[in-house]
């Protein structure tokens, strides 16, 4: 993974309940220059969303305990100050209905786990470039 594409601070909210996946993502993202704010469940993510300024990007697992990624996505899209934040959904299975719902609700992209780290990096960089 290369360094971040711009000099300003890149913050990413990661909502992922699977510990191994979260550790891998935090490592990859930190190497890419991101400051990662991690929530291990949907309720924790909602609390963080209410308390933090909008990040550069959001990665949401679709299947989270307490509040699903789809519920969080809808919640984020209702917050005016978060409207511009790119959101990538992560899913353990390629259920077309969930993917369609996510895109219709306001997700910018999705990735099926297990994911290719280089592909994830490329997708994130694409959204960072668009935002800059």
Residue ranges: model-predicted function:
Residues 23-31:
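Charged docking surfaces used in two-component/phosphorelay signaling
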Residues 108:
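Short, glycine/charged-rich "phosphate-handling" switch motifs in NTP-dependent
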Residues 61, 91:
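Active-site residues of response regulator receiver
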Residues 38-57:
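Acidic, metal-coordinating helix/loop segments flanking the phosphotransfer/catalytic sites
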Residues 115-125:
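C-terminal output helix
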Residues 16:
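Conserved acidic carboxylate
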Residues 65, 83, 95, 113-114:
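The feature encodes the CheY-like receiver
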């Amino acid at each position: 993974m290369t360094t971040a594409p711009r000099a300003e601070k890149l913050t990413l909210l990661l909502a992922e309940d699977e510990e191994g996946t979260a550790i891998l993502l935090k490592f990859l993202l930190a190497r890419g220059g991101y400051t990662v704010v991690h929530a291990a469940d949907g309720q924790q993510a909602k609390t963080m969303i209410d308390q933090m300024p909008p990040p550069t990007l959001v990665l949401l697992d679709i299947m989270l305990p307490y509040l699903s990624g789809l519920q969080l996505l809808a919640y984020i899209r209702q917050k005016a100050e978060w409207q511009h934040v790119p959101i990538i959904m992560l899913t353990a299975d390629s259920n077309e209905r969930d993917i369609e719902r996510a895109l219709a609700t306001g997700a910018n992209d999705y990735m099926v786990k297990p994911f290719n780290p280089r592909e994830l990096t490329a997708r994130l960089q694409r959204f960072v470039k668009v935002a800059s």
